[in-house]
Amino acid sequence: MSLTQQQKDLIFGSLLGDGNLQTGSVGRTWRYRALHKSEHQTYLFHKYEILKPLCGENTLPTESIVFDERTNKEVKRWFFNTLTNPSLKFFADMFYTYDQNTQKWVKDVPVKVQTFLTPQALAYFYIDDGALKWLNKSNAMQICTESFSQGGTIRIQKALKTLYNIDTTLTKKTLQDGRIGYRIAIPEASSGAFREVIKPFLVDCMRYKVSDGNKGHL
């Protein structure tokens, strides 16, 4: 089946964020998986309604409980999976490469990110992985991109500048395994322009992640 523009933007934007694709056939077929903590249940159901045509008739979002070793607490989460779909391989080929050393698929920013980073895709990307930097102190925002390669993160930076004239900086972050990652910082000077690009496509329950221009949130 062909995808609508909203479905394409949701998939692309959320693959830059929390979304992922899974394969059990050595990359021949793929399914999309969305997973969010219980506080974001409404947002997960928003994703489900858009991608429902890709899901099985009996597929519904499901709640699960996992133990978080970092906090020694149980965490409630909601998730859903689509069925495998030929349209998803297009995105998998952009985002994923197979690492022979680890025997795992690795996700990174597509080389052609600029081609697909529409305002709506950017909104989903930010909703998934963005946050205010200092609520009540600054209008600056940030996007947690440290899981990507430095080159991939720079590709996002260049796309934001070329497409929307939004200047950003990179902040170094040390990951749990000791590797260095890079988080995209959206300074105050760029926050207004960034907000105007994504504002028409924000999901109501996630608007609080975006600066209102007065050091608060929408």
Curated annotation (Swiss-Prot):
Its EC number is 3.1.-.-. InterPro entries: Homing_endonucl (IPR027434), LAGLIDADG_dom (IPR004860). It is an enzyme of class 3 (hydrolase). GO terms for cellular component: chloroplast. One of its GO terms (biological process) is intron homing. The keyword Ribosomal protein does not apply. This is DNA endonuclease I-ChuI.
